[in-house]
């Protein structure tokens, strides 16, 4: 499928649902331990890249990232967590991924870069540990077991943002290439 039609739209619905479910899994793993919360981008690189690159390669036309971003926003609405900290990054990342794909004329390079960008769609969820630490700490104290908040702060020094982002990017590139080889994209 190179462009939008009824068949590609139905497949995109499936990709969007898989993307939303994968994103939910990424977010839920953070409840297991503070280290997994800090490593959310790494988990996203592993769990979401295959879905995203598959969708991008199957529909080489505008709107694919928008469908995935919309699925993410619908998920946030469903779980009643559609706050600015979460929704605005999704919108920015979606627009950026669409723009990159368009600039590269929907070729492999643009799709891989777009995939890496889209794996950051849940950054507003976990990025607060670096940019809104007091709020994150308060939420962790209220919502998580005793000691989780302190563990989260200990596991997220400023430098860890760079390590997590780079690892997430590398894993996204690797998973995209593995997916392409497995599914002959």
What are these regions (language model features)?
Residues 40-98:
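Alpha-helical membrane segments and adjacent membrane-interface helices in multi-pass membrane proteins
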Residues 2-60:
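Hydrophobic transmembrane alpha-helices
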Residues 21, 90-126, 176:
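Short helix-perturbing small/polar motifs within transmembrane alpha-helices
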Residues 6-15, 40, 44, 63-68, ...:
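Alpha-helical transmembrane segments of integral membrane proteins
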Residues 1-6, 180-185:
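Short, charged juxtamembrane terminal tails flanking transmembrane helices
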Residues 29-38, 100-109, 181, 185:
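Membrane interface segments of multi-pass transport proteins and intramembrane proteases
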Residues 112-184:
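Membrane-embedded alpha-helical hairpins and interfacial helices in multi-pass inner-membrane proteins
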Residues 16-24, 70-79, 117-128:
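Aromatic-anchored segments of alpha-helical transmembrane domains
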